[in-house]
Amino acid sequence: MKSATRVFNEWVIKNKDDGMQKTHSPAVMDMLQYSLSRLHTAFSFIDAGCGNGWVVRYMNTQPMCTNAIGVDGATEMINKAKRLDTKGRYILSDLLDYQPSKKVDLVHSMEVFYYFIDPSILVNHVKDNWIETKGRLIIGVDYYKENVGCHNWSEDVGTPMKMLSRKDWVDIFHSSGLSNIKHWLSCSNNGFLGTLVITGTVT
């Protein structure tokens, strides 16, 4: 099997990242609106696994967002993000290796955490090293046990993925020490259970 970063590099070359943006946009907007509605002062933001940077570009249009950073481990994704947004901040790094120079108020991630062998390690790393006190982590995953239609994705895409249940994901957030944990299914339609969204705050 290929590494996830190699797969995503190939997808950029084939312009498949544009399709990812279109597919993920409804759930991402749901997550961002949930998060933004709970922010009442200026805030900073990281998109973990930013791809071609479309979420960072969107967040930079938000009046209260003072700093938006995109981090991704795929070279071609970061290169494309920088081409599309010469003023944006995009960093090439494995998420487990990255530590921002200053912690942020909101960390978002869509369809990323299950590419890690042990997602709990990444949740803990982000919680401990990326997020300010009272800040929020919010992630979305379509690859989870109850979503039967996704069970062949790892084989079809040719890269390892960590299959977890909805309860497993929620338990990871609880075990990390995050507080005010909520989860829901976003954008259910046509037999698709929906994107599993999990969020919690640092106290």
Task: Give the residues covered by each predicted segment.
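Class I SAM-dependent methyltransferase SAM/SAH-binding core
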Residues: 46, 52-96
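Conserved class I S-adenosyl-L-methionine
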Residues: 1-38, 145
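Short, glycine-/aromatic-enriched active-site segment of Class I SAM-dependent methyltransferases
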Residues: 141-160
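A short, conserved alpha-helix within the catalytic core of class I
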Residues: 116-126
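A conserved beta-strand element that flanks and buttresses the S-adenosyl-L-methionine
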Residues: 108
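Conserved beta-strand signature within the Rossmann-like core of class I S-adenosyl-L-methionine
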Residues: 134-142
